[in-house]
Amino acid sequence: MNPLGQIPVLMDDGFVLPDAQAILVYLAAKYDSTEAWYSKDPKLQGRITQWLAFADSITGSCSAARLHDKLGFKLNIEQARKEGHQNLRLLDDHLVENKIVGKDWLVLNRPTIADIACFPYVALAEEGGISLNDYPAARSWINRFKKLPQFIVMPGIPPLHGMKNNEGEFFNQEGLCFS
């Protein structure tokens, strides 16, 4: 189905599209008439696209380390973890800078597809042996994400390693807090 031989792949009315980031752009451009997730402003599109590309870097590091630890993929785990920490430092620093100017998300004052693209790899980094302890802004960003009204934990994913939110509460499979 996917000419690149990868997942994910989207089929929409006979249109086949591979690549997670391309799928996010397509879905937002086609179905989000409010521009809540993907702006029509070229400057904002550029910023969003910058973070979509960054999500690919996180895939090659944090997600790769997780594939190694969870599924036994053969790769240079030390290099993947090193790059994962470098990527998390960049993300954390950016989130700190954004917080200073009143933004809680990667590009705007609300989540965009840029946040969606980066979130799963950051949230699951610890499953690849990459601790989030040194990245408080990233941890806060994850917790903000989990508090979104539409947030649903993906089936089969543990409650994000029992990670606590800023109030010291854990999230269960339904995304609800419990002590």
What spans do the regions from the language model cover?
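GST-like domain detector, emphasizing the conserved glutathione-binding G-site
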Residues: 1-85, 97
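A structural signal for well-ordered alpha-helical segments within the folded catalytic domains
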Residues: 21-22, 46, 57, 82-89, ...
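Non-transmembrane alpha-helical segments in soluble domains
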Residues: 24, 28, 49-52, 85-88, ...
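A broad structural signal for alpha-helix termini and local helix breaks/kinks
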Residues: 31, 95, 128-129, 149
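Hydrophobic alpha-helical bundle segments that form small-molecule/ligand-binding pockets
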Residues: 91-107
